[in-house]
UniProtKB/Swiss-Prot annotation:
The keyword Cell cycle applies. The lineage of its organism: Bacteria, Pseudomonadati, Pseudomonadota, Gammaproteobacteria, Enterobacterales. It comes from the Bacteria. Interacts with MinD and FtsZ. It comes from Wigglesworthia glossinidia brevipalpis. This is Probable septum site-determining protein MinC.
């Protein structure tokens, strides 16, 4: 027998043992913005992107934003969605639906519709809950593909390379004194003052307090250079620095 306790935990009545919990969590989700699905080369472009960054796209959930598509594009959606699915993208839903016709088309495909509106009050309250950073977590070995390192309540300092397919996370700042090819997420506790520093930038993914960049967002002039990432005016910003 299972009962619901006042803490929203389900327990076995006889053994008083927790068997499941309900929690609200925030996750990073890739959003693909579409502007014209009639374009002949769009499939080739997406396919090449997946091939070049296979570690990034592998099992990564994504949302398709159709805000900029025309009414004419509605007739091509079913075919386009099928082609995208065949490329291996894990599409969980669609955002940017601006009329009921689009909503009907999307729901027929069995996809969820995500609203783009943000509850500013809730966001503000969460933003104030900053985790206190107590110390530094230092690693002098390379971070291999498939590894995930999390520096809880700490700054993370890596004195080596972060390989493609690896992920480093910290509640505070991240310093990488080597080649950065993987994924880095600083300010995991929503601290917008957190920063990321690396001496050679080739990252697949960069995030600070939920503000994200992927590799294609980075101009070529910054690749391979010493840079820092920080948030300015609520925007994730990149800046070169001298060693």
């Amino acid at each position: 027998m299972i009962i619901l306790d006042i803490n929203q935990n389900y327990k076995y009545f006889m053994f008083n043992k927790v068997c499941l919990k309900f929690k609200i969590k925030n996750f990073n989700i890739l959003v693909i913005y579409l502007y014209d699905i009639k374009e002949k080369n769009i499939y080739k472009t997406i396919k090449n992107k997946i091939k070049n960054f296979s570690y990034f796209f592998k099992k990564m959930p994504c949302i398709i934003n159709i805000k900029y598509l025309s009414e004419e594009d509605q007739y091509f959606w079913k075919y386009f969605h099928k082609k995208l699915s065949n490329l291996g993208l894990c599409i969980i839903g669609v955002s940017g639906c601006n009329n009921k016709i689009w909503e009907k088309i999307i729901t027929r495909n069995g996809l969820l519709i995500f609203k783009e509106q943000i509850n500013k009050k809730i966001f503000y309250e969460k933003k104030n809950k900053i985790t206190k950073i107590n110390n530094n977590y230092i690693i002098d070995k390379p971070i291999r593909s498939g590894q995930t390192i999390y520096a809880k309540k700490k700054n993370l300092i890596i004195m080596n390379t972060v390989n493609s397919g690896a992920e480093v996370i910290a509640d505070g700042d991240i310093h990488i004194y080597g080649i950065m090819r993987g994924r880095a997420s600083a300010g995991a506790s929503k601290d917008t003052k957190s920063q990321i520093f690396c001496t050679k930038l080739y990252a697949e993914f960069i995030s600070i307090a939920g503000k994200n960049w992927i590799n294609e967002n980075v101009l070529n002039s910054y690749l391979g250079k010493p840079v820092r990432f920080y948030i300015k005016n609520d925007i994730l910003t990149i800046q070169k620095f001298s060693l």
